[in-house]
């Protein structure tokens, strides 16, 4: 398929046309969204204009699509986590590497000390993190708590590296980009939420097949998210950390060529995931096998959830997301660097 018909218009491929996990949303979505959104807004992290744009992104929808089978309490954990992610994301996007290093240190200190008051003059992300984790650990096993903190430290350090790349205008190649993107996307701590009520031992989660399935789902999430976010990111001059720009630079191709490359790469990942899911899962006995099945299905569902949210929220396509999901053609936005901390408003553009 030709994915660009002019320099100003391009086609967004549907990489999940045959993905077997359908859209599924948690029945507690509206109720938990109300509570988590009010909690996130209570910190005053953004100015009114940016807060309005942030709310339109509906990160609670992402959590409700990603955790459709979780209880109301654990869905609240997922919603709070998504909101916490994107507070850090929006601040780090416009901060110097030095400031992002400090933000990451504050977050990790708050995770390790959820009952200790934060300094009054500290960056707001510290208190957001502390409150999130203090509530989350009430419904998480000890193993899940440990894994979450380990995964979140890797995530924060990758965001620091991303800030350094941005500061130096450094464009990675595909392999090194995906290696870092697997961390910056936040999938690893997000996957731990799937385990919070499970008793899976470390040796199960460290098994090569489980690790491969986790990596494959993460890569598909990365590619899908980068496809959706590319237009907004290139418009605000923040597209160096995006697979479309990476592929264009490495292979000397245009947007059409980059989209074609991503489609083919995504298809390989999809085939590998489905083969392992259908043929490669070991058995750990009648007590653990149902948990493993639920966890791996959660990985597959996360791929669908991320893609659906990209179109159903207003983060990347404004109010036109559902229309674009159907027609797939979009106009390339004109470059305009965002001035405010917070998601870029896109409804005024001719998407």
UniProtKB/Swiss-Prot annotation:
Keywords of this entry: Calcium, Cobalt, Lyase, Magnesium, Manganese, Metal-binding, Nickel
Which residues of the sequence carry a binding annotation for Mg(2+) 1? 89
Q: Where is this motif: NSE motif?
A: 225-233
- Quote the record's binding site residues for (2E,6E)-farnesyl diphosphate: 315-316
- Names of required cofactors: Mg(2+); Mn(2+); Ca(2+); Ni(2+)
Q: Where is this motif: D(D/E)XX(D/E) motif?
A: 89-93
Q: Which reaction is catalysed here?
A: (2E,6E)-farnesyl diphosphate = Delta(6)-protoilludene + diphosphate; (2E,6E)-farnesyl diphosphate = alpha-selinene + diphosphate
> What task does this protein carry out?
Terpene cyclase that catalyzes the cyclization of farnesyl diphosphate (FPP) to delta(6)-protoilludene. In presence of Ca(2+), a significant switch from 1,11 to a dual 1,11/1,10 cyclization occurs, producing beta-elemene as the major product, with lower levels of delta(6)-protoilludene and (E)-beta-caryophyllene, and traces of beta-selinene and alpha-selinene.
Q: Does the keyword Calcium apply?
A: yes
Q: How is the cofactor bound?
A: Mg(2+) and Mn(2+) are more tightly associated with the active site motifs (D(D/E)XX(D/E) and NSE) and thus lead to more efficient removal of PPi.
Annotated site (Plays a critical role in the stabilization of intermediate cation), which positions?
86
Q: Please state what the protein is called.
A: Delta(6)-protoilludene synthase STEHIDRAFT_25180
Q: Where does Mg(2+) 3 bind?
A: 225, 229, 233
Stated EC number for the protein is 4.2.3.-, 4.2.3.135, 4.2.3.198
Q: Which GO terms describe its biological process?
A: isoprenoid biosynthetic process
What's noted about domains in the record? The 2 conserved active-site motifs D(D/E)XX(D/E) and NSE are required for coordinating the divalent metal ions that stabilize the PPi moiety of the substrate.
